[in-house]
A protein has these predicted regions:
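N-terminal secretory signal peptides that target proteins for export/translocation
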Residues: 1-10
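Compositionally biased, intrinsically disordered or flexible polar/acidic segments
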Residues: 10, 24-29, 596
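Bacterial N-terminal signal peptides
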Residues: 13-25
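Mature N-terminal, pre-catalytic/accessory segment of carbohydrate-active enzymes
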Residues: 26-289, 361, 498, 632, ...
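Carbohydrate-binding surfaces of carbohydrate-active enzymes
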Residues: 38, 71-73, 78, 92, ...
Length: 785
């Protein structure tokens, strides 16, 4: 079983609670029946400094489980759980369904309950995906008028006589929730309607707004079904030189993001599973149905969205404003910018509201310490149109206790989300088609302040075994190496230190009327990370939500991070209140302030003198910004961390740490990690200086230490430790040991030995008798250690 280890001032560490007790306040902890000397497969310890987080304990390992048809056979779930209980160090399974069933079906509920009970009894907690997208048919049956629409604007020249016809093909979208190979229905077209039709004169610079006419009533519907919308328009002599602009609305097999009953329906799903011993619930990659290479003349729309838009902008009609957003109109550039600003802000705020309602429901149904999973990122890069139109870059506003991302999300985003969540680490769901890639990623993640949520190898090779998705990560030493790295979790109480904030203009990054669409300043962040000066990437909307704020010492602060420097990128279309924030920051002079990009219009499209409003910020070109900031950081005596290399392939490039180097956490922990040549780690025989105190390590893979203000050791973690010299703490071991050692809240030493048989080594027993033991998983063809 997996247990929670509660340090206390007693001669023997007490290991208490099942996984449920670790997450659910409603479940009382129970004393383990086994001896304290018996190795456990997972241990969680209470961490200091977690007042801002609902989760007070260290995080266990996390792996993905995708339930397919075999898992829904009687006892079919046991194979995956048995394998991962024996051959991984995971304590949690973020679990979703890749099968043609819905979570609202009683038989599915019952199978998931059996699986969750079995997993719990084998030391694993199931965090189940209970998103509405796994119950689309049930939602549509109950609320048939609350499905998502996508409006496609297409145009055709009109003639002076006769009739013109235009056919607009239907839409079919899909993602990981709609695996076609498993027979799951895509986000296909359910029905089609003509939303509106306009005619106007359009020149090279845009439509002449004085010529716009609503010609919806002139249109004759020839076909409106799941295949297309086809309309005929009788023409008139006055139509010569004009164009028709047809807005076709396709209703998709997906709930409307703005559906009035969406949040209520998802809450009911969670309540349906209240009797299941889940460790939490997942909502993965939420947003509108994702579109690859999205067109700027296709925009999401529903009557519920139109109502919200009218509420935000009295006197404005969303259907009419869609024409303005898509097609520039002469002399209406400010109005167009404002319409897009409101539309996109409305969208990302609604996506965040749905996410946060789901978070609240998880806590209400499963308890305050239940896990809210997984990641809000989809096409995981802030500088892609795919992500912009999927969710409006709402990532920072989606509440989590553990910062979570996926795939190749830039490290500057991962670290920022850790600050927002007040989580000591971030977790990134990673996959690749090559198993060898995971080895380097494991160490890169650690040096960037994070860990991997292990997604199976994907896509599997053509000749892979049928159960490769189940077993692909359990061969070799990958899982064992992850256990070594996760020794850091016992002593990491705060996220990685990033002294720079790159604050990108959220409106500009979402607005295609200006030059800043999908430009979040990542190139500047990359240039900083490349040199080892880490930066958090944060949207400007976090200022208006009062999450990015001025600290009591006058510095700009995000979660636990105080910034030595902050750069505002592309403030175009911001509200004037943003300037007030930076004027106050400039007056306090605790954070160096920089700006890239012009600010000539505010959120409503009105003329704005940003240069004067931001006079306290040094204006730089994007090319010069990183160098200027690095010079300032060096003048403060700040040292770089692990340098980075660029990741390319499939997404805009972003920086990732080398697999060998050094980083520092905000709690003062210094981490050395090295895994460039061996997945289990490379030798670390090194002396470092921490505030003039020398520390010498002889270890493998990881060597981490935190000193108190007097220079005494407060916590340490190391792989295959042979020796440590740090002030009055001297350790010399005849055999290498994986260990973590820390002071509990009473000031007493507590420790964990991993993969160690036999008596506690005498040098360690002299430090404390409070040692717990962790079992090491063995590769799938070996026995556990």
């Amino acid at each position: 079983m997996s247990h929670t280890h509660h340090p206390r001032p007693c001669p023997i560490p007490v290991v208490v609670a099942t996984l449920l007790a670790a997450f659910f306040c409603s479940t009382e902890p129970t004393r383990a029946q086994s001896s304290a000397d018996a190795p456990q497969r997972s241990i969680r310890v209470e961490l200091p400094g977690q007042e801002q987080n609902a989760i007070k304990n260290s995080w266990p390992g996390i792996s993905c489980w995708f339930m397919t048809a075999p898992d829904f056979e009687p006892d079919g779930f046991k194979r995956f759980i048995d394998l991962h209980s024996s051959h991984s160090g995971a304590g949690l399974l973020t679990t979703s369904i890749r099968h043609n069933v819905e979570v609202t079906q009683p038989a599915v509920h019952d199978q998931i309950k059996r699986a969750a009970v079995y997993a719990r009894d084998h030391g694993l907690g199931v965090v189940m995906d209970l998103d509405v997208r796994l119950a689309r048919q049930a939602f549509m049956s109950k609320y048939p008028d609350e499905m998502q629409e996508l409006v496609c604007l297409r145009e055709i020249p009109l003639t002076s006589s006769g009739e013109v016809t235009l056919s607009i093909p239907s839409i079919e979208l899909s993602d990981h929730y709609t695996p076609g190979a498993s027979g799951v229905r895509p986000y296909g077209t359910l029905s089609t309607r003509l939303l509106a039709a306009y005619s106007a004169v359009e020149g090279a610079d845009g439509i002449d707004p004085s010529t716009i006419q609503d010609i919806s009533s002139r249109c004759r519907i020839l076909q409106a079904d799941t295949n297309c919308l086809r309309v005929a328009i009788p023409t008139l002599p006055a139509d010569a030189g004009r164009k028709a602009f047809i807005l076709a609305a396709f209703t998709l097999f997906s709930p409307d993001v703005f559906a009035p009953h969406l949040i209520e329906f998802e809450r009911a799903i969670l309540k349906q599973y209240a009797d299941v011993p889940l460790a939490g619930a997942c909502k993965d990659e939420w947003g509108f149905p994702g579109r690859f290479a999205p067109r700027l003349d296709d925009l999401y729309f529903t009557p519920a969205m139109a109502l919200e838009y009218a509420h935000r902008r009295p006197g404005h009609d969303l259907a009419r404003d869609l024409l303005l957003m898509i097609k520039p109109q002469l002399g209406r550039e400010p109005e167009r910018a404002a319409a897009i600003n409101h539309y996109m802000e409305m969208n990302w705020q609604r996506n965040a509201a749905v996410e946060n309602a789901f978070y609240d429901s998880i806590k209400q149904v499963f308890g305050p310490r239940a896990m809210a999973a997984t990641h809000p990122t989809w096409f995981p890069h802030p500088e892609t149109r795919e992500e912009v139109f999927k969710n409006g870059l709402h990532w920072w506003a989606a509440r989590r206790d553990l910062a979570q991302t996926d795939e190749v999300t830039p490290f500057s985003v991962r670290t920022a989300l850790a600050k927002k969540s007040h989580s000591p680490i971030w977790m990134n769901m990673f996959y690749d088609g090559n198993l060898a890639t995971y080895s380097g990623e494991l160490w890169r993640h650690a040096l960037g302040g994070g860990r991997i949520n292990f997604h199976p190898v994907y896509p599997p090779g053509a000749n892979s075994p049928t159960d490769y998705l189940t077993t692909s990560l359990l061969h070799g030493n990958l899982m064992t190496a992850d256990c070594r790295i996760r020794l850091l979790n016992f002593i990491s109480t705060a996220p990685i230190d990033c002294p720079v904030a790159i604050i990108f203009g959220h409106p500009a990054a979402l607005n295609w009327a200006g030059p800043g669409l999908a430009d979040t300043g990542l190139k500047i962040a990359n240039a900083l990370w490349e040199q080892g000066f880490y930066a958090d990437l944060i949207p400007s909307s976090e200022i208006s939500s009062k999450n990015l704020k001025l600290a009591t010492d006058g510095s700009i602060q995000y979660g636990p991070q105080h910034y030595a420097a902050a750069l505002l990128h592309h403030p175009q279309y911001e509200r004037p209140a943003l300037a007030t924030f930076f004027r106050k920051a400039a007056a306090l002079r605790r954070t160096a302030l920089y700006r890239t990009g012009e600010w000539t219009r505010d959120f409503e499209g009105r003329t704005f003198d940003g240069a004067t409003a931001l006079a306290g910020m040094k204006s730089l070109s994007p090319e010069a910004a990183a160098g200027e900031i690095i010079s300032h950081l060096k003048s403060l005596g700040l040292q770089p961390q692990t340098t980075c290399t660029k990741r390319d392939g499939g997404f805009p490039g972003s920086m990732m740490p080398l697999p060998s180097g050094q980083c520092r956490l905000l709690d003062g922990t210094v981490i050395l990690a090295s895994g460039a040549t061996d997945v289990m780690g490379d030798p670390i025989q090194k002396t470092i200086q921490i505030a003039s105190h020398p520390v010498r390590f002889d270890a493998v893979g990881i060597a981490a230490i935190r000193l108190d203000k007097s220079g005494k050791v407060d916590a340490l973690a190391a792989g295959a430790l042979r020796s440590l010299s740090a002030g009055d703490l001297q350790i010399e071991l005849t055999s290498p040991v994986d260990l973590a050692l820390w002071h509990d809240s009473h000031g007493h030493w507590q420790g964990v030995l991993q993969g160690w048989d036999g008596p506690i080594p005498e040098p360690l027993a002299r430090i404390t008798t409070h040692w717990a033991r962790l079992r090491l998983p063995a590769p799938v063809d070996q026995s556990p250690r």
